[in-house]
């Protein structure tokens, strides 16, 4: 094919392909197959349909684009460069996959303006997309008026065979179909190739029928390599279907244009090699040097800048009219978008004294959620089919269902993994919504990827985890977390808080809400069983991670360190030791990372180096505790699986009793 016969659209599509090929060749690393095969569908979408403003990547009413098949990241970087985003220059493309570049191996929303979510682990992106679409539907139902639609945008996702093999995509797609999210459109790059070769070796189901059974509208574009009009008509049709999401199956050839590697696994995840690049240039009629895009092509693709300015200008006029007619709603909408919390929001968090009835911290959590929801209507979330165990319902506010998108209570069903990724999508919508997702702490293992990605991608999700220890009881070791807290505490940028009573639960929510507004996730671990309200606990001191709950005159002989339900054991043991003339301090270490972040003087004031006799008490693994107890300390912990018995029996049998804490303390004291 000669260059002269190609239209500007065809040249633009080849520009995408060769920016990807050249960047991957220079890096000697990457995945050229998807960008080469999916370039036509991506360009038709970005050039003819998507509404966005390259000069204002955070314009609120933009359409959201998610590359769920994140390994094909050069597809997105090429699009950002060609359409005029300042975040990706040709120099950035040359630095693909290099140290501190804005073009990392997989898309990272915190590195590259124009990237909405961090993708890479396959299937996360389509589930994030469901979250983005939920956010749009919720805000539209809350704020739009018959004469003014200020929330009106689509979520587009490109996903691949690998995404569709992953369980999380099935969870999320099933849920999206149930909800009838009509502004969610997924383009499935159906190229039949995975790393191991043809997908025939492992993946032979009818994906279209599967999505139809989920309640999606399904369209098939048989030639995704050259039939641009078929792609156009499919997206047009998808937008016309408003009562259900649409999956457009676009059959493509992976590595399209490569004479010897197209339609093979060899083009999936490795550079083409110099000889094959030259042959591909010849085959596709691309005579330009590496990283060179002809001026006429750039002029054409960068018409997106003018279009985008127009889209935003039109929306600004719509919003100005809305604000004039509905000033109260506009003020609240602007508060959402600004990330500002309602004045005095934290004053609703309850405080407790020892005279108040002891309750499970999950019950205190329910109280906090409902108090907060009354002043922070941006809270939205729910449980993975454990609403009445996790106690996460916002009472009197209704369920988020098809036709009832204004309501905040989401029933995620038994879909922990999907729930996590959906919550991240809601958080990363950029509209001030605060999502929360709940399950038993042990089942955080089912959603570890999205919990980790919330921390990596700076998503302000709140993870509400109940039944946090062997105190869970009769369900037995399959449901009793042991190593779970340690593994979660190891995730960078994730704050894990295990509150001891009502005051600390209020403090935990205060931290979680503030972190959410600062684009950081928090995991809260709550008890199934009752715990007493303690005299020395503090709402505000939870933010320090660790603080003194019970103190003594002078230098302590012993420091007892506890979290959650075991803090009360420490307090009671300290009282008994005090009666025997011992000087004992009790420290709550509810959030390790928050304590670690305090200055050295504060940490020394709580855990002085001179006091080496320290005893940690936590109904979880000992892993990580030696940082705080030192080589001369000890721990009452559990480093084996639990057992099926009433929770109190489990705790007693495994040594979580005042008597055992006393015995261990006396051993340390000599």
Curated annotation (Swiss-Prot):
PROSITE patterns: TRANSKETOLASE_1, TRANSKETOLASE_2. Coiled coil: none annotated. The keyword Transmembrane helix does not apply. NCBIfam families: tktlase_bact. SUPFAM superfamilies: Thiamin diphosphate-binding fold (THDP-binding), TK C-terminal domain-like. Belongs to the transketolase family. One of its GO terms (biological process) is pentose-phosphate shunt. The record marks 31, 268 as: Important for catalytic activity. One of its GO terms (cellular component) is cytosol. Its EC number is 2.2.1.1. GO terms for molecular function: metal ion binding; transketolase activity. Its cofactor is Mg(2+); Ca(2+); Mn(2+); Co(2+). The gene is tkt. It comes from Nostoc sp. (strain PCC 7120 / SAG 25.82 / UTEX 2576). Mg(2+) binds at residues 161, 191, 193. InterPro entries: THDP-binding (IPR029061), Transketo_C/PFOR_II (IPR009014), Transketolase-like_C_2 (IPR055152), Transketolase-like_Pyr-bd (IPR005475), Transketolase_bac-like (IPR005478), Transketolase_BS (IPR020826), Transketolase_CS (IPR049557), Transketolase_fam (IPR033247). Homodimer. Substrate binds at residues 31, 268, 362, 389, 467, 475, 528. The keyword Plastid does not apply. Binds 1 Mg(2+) ion per subunit. Can also utilize other divalent metal cations, such as Ca(2+), Mn(2+) and Co(2+). It catalyses: D-sedoheptulose 7-phosphate + D-glyceraldehyde 3-phosphate = aldehydo-D-ribose 5-phosphate + D-xylulose 5-phosphate. The active site is at 416 (proton donor). Keywords: Calcium, Magnesium, Metal-binding, Thiamine pyrophosphate, Transferase. This is Transketolase. Thiamine diphosphate binds at residues 71, 120-122, 162, 191, 268, 443. Catalyzes the transfer of a two-carbon ketol group from a ketose donor to an aldose acceptor, via a covalent intermediate with the cofactor thiamine pyrophosphate.
């Amino acid at each position: 094919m000669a260059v002269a016969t190609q239209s500007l659209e065809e040249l633009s599509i080849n520009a995408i392909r060769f920016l990807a090929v050249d960047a991957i060749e220079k890096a000697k690393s990457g995945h050229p197959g998807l960008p080469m095969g999916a370039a036509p569908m991506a360009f038709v979408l970005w050039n003819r349909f998507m509404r966005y403003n390259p000069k204002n990547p955070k314009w609120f009413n933009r359409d959201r684009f998610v590359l769920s098949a994140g390994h094909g990241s050069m597809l997105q970087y090429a699009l950002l460069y060609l359409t005029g985003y300042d975040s990706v220059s040709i120099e950035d493309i040359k630095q693909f996959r290099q140290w501190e570049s804005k073009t990392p191996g997989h898309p990272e929303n915190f590195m590259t303006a124009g990237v909405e979510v961090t993708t890479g682990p396959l299937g996360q992106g389509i589930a994030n997309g469901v979250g983005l679409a939920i956010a749009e539907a919720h805000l539209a139902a809350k704020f739009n008026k018959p004469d003014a639609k200020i929330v009106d945008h689509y979520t587009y996702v490109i996903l691949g065979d690998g995404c569709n093999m992953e369980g999380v995509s099935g969870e999320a797609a099933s849920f999206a179909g149930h909800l009838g999210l009509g502004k969610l459109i997924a383009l499935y790059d159906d190229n039949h190739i995975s790393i191991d070769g043809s997908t025939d070796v492992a993946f032979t189901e009818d994906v279209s029928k599967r999505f139809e059974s989920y309640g999606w509208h399904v369209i098939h574009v048989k030639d995704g390599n050259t039939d641009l009009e078929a792609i156009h008509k499919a997206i047009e049709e998808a937008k016309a279907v408003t009562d259900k999401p649409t999956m457009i199956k676009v059959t493509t050839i992976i590595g399209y244009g490569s004479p010897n590697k197209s339609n093979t696994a060899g083009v999936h995840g490795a550079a083409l090699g110099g000889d094959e690049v030259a042959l591909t240039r010849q085959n596709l009629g691309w005579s330009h040097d590496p990283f060179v895009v002809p001026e006429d092509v750039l002029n054409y693709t960068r018409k997106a800048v003018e279009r985008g300015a127009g889209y935003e200008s039109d929306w600004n006029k719509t919003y100005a009219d809305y604000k004039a007619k509905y000033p109260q709603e506009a003020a609240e909408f602007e508060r959402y978008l600004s990330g500002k919390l309602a004045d005095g929001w934290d004053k609703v968090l309850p405080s407790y004294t020892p005279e108040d009835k002891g309750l499970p911290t999950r019950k205190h959590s329910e109280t906090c959620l409902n108090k907060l929801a009354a002043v922070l209507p941006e809270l939205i979330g729910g449980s993975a089919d454990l609403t009445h165990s996790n106690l996460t319902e916002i009472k009197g506010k209704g369920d988020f269902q098809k036709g009832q998108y204004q309501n905040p209570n989401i029933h995620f069903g038994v879909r922990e993994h999907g729930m996590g990724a959906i919550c991240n999508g809601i958080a990363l919508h950029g509209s001030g919504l605060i999502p929360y997702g709940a399950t038993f702490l042990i089942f955080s293992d089912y959603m570890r990827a999205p919990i980790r990605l919330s921390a990596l991608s700076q998503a302000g999700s709140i993870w509400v985890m109940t039944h946090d220890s062997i105190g869970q009881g009769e369900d037995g070791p399959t449901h009793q977390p042991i190593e779970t807290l340690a593994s979660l505490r190891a995730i960078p940028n994730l704050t894990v808080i295990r509150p001891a009573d009502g005051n600390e639960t209020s403090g935990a929510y205060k931290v979680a809400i503030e972190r959410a507004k600062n684009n950081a996730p928090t995991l809260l671990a709550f008890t199934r069983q009752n715990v007493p309200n303690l005299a020395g606990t503090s709402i505000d001191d939870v933010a320090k991670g660790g603080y003194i709950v019970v103190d003594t005159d002078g230098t302590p002989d012993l420091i007892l360190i506890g979290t959650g339900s075991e803090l009360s054991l420490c307090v009671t043991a300290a009282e008994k030791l005090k009666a025997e003339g011992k000087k004992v301090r009790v420290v709550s270490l509810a959030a390790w990372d928050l304590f670690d972040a305090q200055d050295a003087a504060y940490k020394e004031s709580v855990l002085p180096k001179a006091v080496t006799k320290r005893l940690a008490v936590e109904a979880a693994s000992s892993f990580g505790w030696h940082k705080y107890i030192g080589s001369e300390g000890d721990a009452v912990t559990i480093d084996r699986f639990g057992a099926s018995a009433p929770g109190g029996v489990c705790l007693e049998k495994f040594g979580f009793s005042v008597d055992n804490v006393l015995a261990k303390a006396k051993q340390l004291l000599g």
